[in-house]
Amino acid sequence: VHSAKIFTENVIGEVVSTEPNLITKKTDNNLDKSFKHICLGISASGPTKRWNINNYIRLAEEISKKIKCKFYIAGGKNDINLINKFKNSDVGKNCISFENLSIKETLPTLRGIDLYVGNDTGWAHISVALKVKALTVFCDSPIFSYGAYSKRMVTVEPEGVEKGKTTHDTLGKDKVSLNKVLSEALKLLN
């Protein structure tokens, strides 16, 4: 929690609590209310913490079959290959990438989304601070430290790992169930 708190504070230049409440300037984000807006946090601090991009594509395809939605791809210049793979997929036409925006520039959009689904990254923690529900995939980082501080954060862990017991050595990115993430995402969107 402490690392996520420091990261968020450094990015936004403000102090946040462990149940963060980030207040931003009110700006019109012009998000079409006839859609559900979902931020997909495909970025991660390392390959063992990153759920496979193909899972995000399949997740977006499945959600799109059930709900009219738009996707926002949270990643930066270091994630360009992943972003392009998503943009070139069948659901890519329904997405907007944050690749050329600073985190601060994404805040008006993030504030208006319905759900964050993604890896345990700064995007998840900023979303929670903006009072957005976050479905956070923990592949190889401790939920106890990074995912248990907010009622707005729902976590998914690798299959076979006891709830709340992921660590930095779990190495579970290939054991996170797409069906579990899909099921939780649909619950949070309804």
Segments (PLM) and residue ranges:
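Catalytic machinery of carbohydrate-active enzymes
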Residues: 1-190
